[in-house]
Amino acid sequence: MQFSIVYFLVFLIPSTQSTGFLSLKLTSDHDCLVHLEIQSMEYSETVRLLAYETKSLEIFTPEITNQLSIHFQILHHFSGVSLSDVSSQLFKLDNNGIWEPRVIDSDQVILSIQSNFHCQKGFYGPICERRSRSTSTIKTTTSIPTATSSPFHLPISEVQINNLIIYAVLSSVVLLLIIANCFLCFCRPKPSKYIDYTFQNVFPMDEFFPMEKTIGSPDTEYFDSSSRYYSTITLQSRV
């Protein structure tokens, strides 16, 4: 009878197991490689860190105890030579929303570690040991656009067409102004040039000086009778 009661209590009380994620933030003061290893989960990973660079990791913890042991080892960033001994760190899988800091101090590199544990979706409780059985229904509403629009808002297509019309009109006006300016610059009338052929003193020469020819005088004048208007040529000859 006592054995049956104990057997019943074992199946009635849930075991202390958790299902969630252990988040880690790693920061170092020098360039290095950090090698992580979890023997209970057959998990291993190597992370490259630059100086004062923070990298985040998430380790899935399915159905394990409320504590997790992780082995850390700091390596040289280029050669991979060990810069510290293997350090075993024990993390509590406590879903309290608090980041717990810790430091691994070696001779050459200081490694800062921040840890936080949070439950997987569908689990809750201090160590994520309880599974949620409630289901939530989400109502989604899809709005179908109608063809009618409010009188104060134009459809996007009409607004685009109106903008194109306005741009076309403005472009045409600017083009016409440019053509008109070019026409005025290259086709304006040139200033006229003329020669005044009027003579102030025009008179017939044969009315005052008849044709004559003087021989033997030092000055000989010849009169051109074919032209009656101011076409006298005077030649002087010296003997």
Swiss-Prot record:
The answer, when asked if ATP-binding is one of the entry's keywords, is no
An example GO biological process term is: mesendoderm development
Q: Which domain of life is it from?
A: Eukaryota
Tell me the leader sequence span.
Answer: none
| Keyword terms of this UniProt record | Developmental protein
- The answer to whether keyword Transmembrane helix applies is no
Describe the task this protein carries out: May have a role in mesendoderm development during embryogenesis.
Record-linked PANTHER family: PROTEIN CBG11437-RELATED, SKN-1 DEPENDENT ZYGOTIC TRANSCRIPT 1 PROTEIN
The protein in question is named Skn-1 dependent zygotic transcript 1 protein
Q: What organism does the record attribute this protein to? A: Caenorhabditis briggsae
Gene that specifies this protein? sdz-1.2
